[in-house]
Amino acid sequence: MGKGPLSFRRLSSIRHRKKGSAVKDDSAQTSTPSSPPPPLPIHAGGSAVGATGKAKKKTGGARLWMRFDRTGAMEVVECDKSTIIKRASVPARDLRILGPVFSHSSNILAREKAIVVNLEVIKAIVTAEEVLLLDPLRPEVLPFVERLKQQFPQRNGNENALQASANVQSPLDPEAAEGLQSELPFEFQVLEIALEVVCSFVDKSVAALETEAWPVLDELTKNVSTENLEYVRSLKSNLTRLLARVQKVRDELEHLLDDNEDMADLYLTRKWIQNQQTEAILAGTASNSIALPAHNTSNLHRLTSNRSASMVTSNTEEDDVEDLEMLLEAYFMQLDGMRNKILTVREYIDDTEDYVNIQLDNQRNELIQLQLTLTIASFAIAAETLLASLFGMNIPCPLYSIHGVFGYFVWSVTALCIVLFMVTLGYARWKKLLGS
């Protein structure tokens, strides 16, 4: 009996404690969707930090990433795949696409909350609030980082706090949602910068290839040598690799342009706004259903569901994929122009090879004609040698006893061989075996 009141007080204090923690959890959950995502849970060394403050051991698959959000805040960290998967809500196979095995492939993949971008040297995961860039310190990636800094200048803490408070107070304001959709979304701005950097990088490579190609090909037409042929061979191999790179990026853009559903899936900001509107409507429905009678609750649910469906359909029908389609078409035409330049250089290389082959065929024909002429001359000389050998035998002959017949015999045999040579040569030209 002495422990009764004490136990009752203890239970009541526990209940009060649970209610207070539940209120805190509810407030934390309501403020989470509208606030920007927290920084990556990693320190400068790259390993995760636990609740006790002790750093865990660095995992073997940690790589260098850069986090850049829409407010211009930037941090370079080193983290493993699991951290990125939880942060961006992407499957593990998408991180394999960003790995070294698929370094020469080009992909733009739409996921529920992120876009996986693998374009040449740019490997990133783009969400509606931030971009996670892999290996940001590479020299080829630095122009992309600089363009991000120019496009999204860093704001001070007061501006970020005001924006966060405005989002918390009115996260579902229709005018604010319309303003977000009127300007180009954050993910499309990042995608545009990535395509711009890739096109600029490829354009420089194409210009360098053209500058190197024309003098080498002109020199080859004048002088067919082993050194010039080696230059053209290396030039053609570089051209083939560059054409394959441009073709991969162009094919990826063409694949997106051919499928409106894939382009619609890239609208991360639109999906985020629709989710916020739906959550607000459901929250309003729940609050109103508490005050209304039971027979009016079903009607209210029906009206709110129709309203949410109409808002979602209106948002998706409005400017469906026009902005993204115009963006992709611009860079698709630019890549197509680069591809045409490369094909022009390759056609010129093919024409030069044909010209060199014609020259070599002509020289080969001249050598064959010379060989045939020498063969005819050898035949005539062989006939003269045959006559000389016949009369050089040690056999009785009446011509041996005639004085001074040797000179006439030699000159007559020589003249006969010359006539034989001219007749055979004329016959070969008559049959068009030799040029005129």
Swiss-Prot record:
Residues 12-21 have a biased composition (Basic residues). Belongs to the CorA metal ion transporter (MIT) (TC 1.A.35.5) family. PANTHER family: MAGNESIUM TRANSPORTER MRS2-4-RELATED, RNA SPLICING PROTEIN MRS2, MITOCHONDRIAL. A motif (Required for magnesium transport activity) lies at residues 392-394. It comes from the Eukaryota. SUPFAM superfamilies: Magnesium transport protein CorA, transmembrane region. Expressed in the whole plant except roots. Has the ability to complement a mutant in yeast lacking magnesium transport capability. The keyword Membrane applies. It comes from Arabidopsis thaliana. The keyword Iron does not apply. One of its GO terms (molecular function) is magnesium ion transmembrane transporter activity. The chain crosses the membrane at residues 372-392, 405-425. It is found in: Membrane. Keywords: Ion transport, Magnesium, Membrane, Transmembrane, Transmembrane helix, Transport. It holds the Pfam family MRS2-like. Disulfide bonds: none annotated. GO terms for cellular component: membrane. This is Magnesium transporter MRS2-4. Magnesium transporter that may mediate the influx of magnesium.
